[in-house]
């Protein structure tokens, strides 16, 4: 299994949680194709809304990929994003700042936001555990 962070505004995360899906990189399929059933995805939201929301800087959802391949949906004639189905877990929105020193994927703590510019990226099991614990995710429920 691989662990991922997907950088998405909170309003888009909430839409995905309601619909049980994720998109990445403005609907492009590339990173979604790298994911496999059972992979963990943590959602980080720099803002409350896209594109002009208030700063948030929090982990806003967590779940596991629930299908085998990306699929395309038609939103409008010229916007047909790719998606993956996700089984979301109950969690609490968690600010990132108290976790920065504990997260290995943030190599330069003074420029902690840099990594999120990549949109979707892998994290190790340690970082997943730190985030999952902070989000009060109970895997036994």
Swiss-Prot record:
**What CDD domains does the record point to?**
EVE-like
Alphabetical list of Gene3D superfamilies matching this protein: ph1033 like domains (3.10.590.10)
The record's comment on protein family reads: Belongs to the UPF0310 family.
Which HAMAP family did the record assign?
UPF0310
Q: List the disulfide bonds.
A: none
**What name has this protein been given in UniProt?**
UPF0310 protein Mflv_0785
């Amino acid at each position: 299994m691989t662990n991922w962070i997907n950088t998405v505004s909170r309003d888009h995360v909430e839409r995905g949680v309601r619909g049980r899906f994720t998109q990445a990189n403005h609907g492009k399929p590339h990173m979604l194709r790298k994911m496999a059933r059972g992979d963990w995805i943590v959602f980080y939201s720099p803002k409350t809304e896209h594109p002009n929301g208030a700063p948030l800087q929090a982990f806003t959802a967590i779940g596991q990929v629930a299908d085998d391949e990306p699929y395309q949906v038609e939103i409008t004639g010229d916007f047909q994003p790719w998606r993956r189905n996700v089984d979301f877990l109950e969690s609490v929105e968690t600010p990132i700042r108290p976790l920065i020193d504990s997260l290995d994927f943030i190599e330069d703590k003074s420029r902690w936001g840099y990594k999120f510019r990549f949109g979707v990226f892998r994290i190790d099991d340690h970082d997943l555990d730190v985030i999952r614990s902070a989000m009060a995710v109970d895997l036994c429920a």
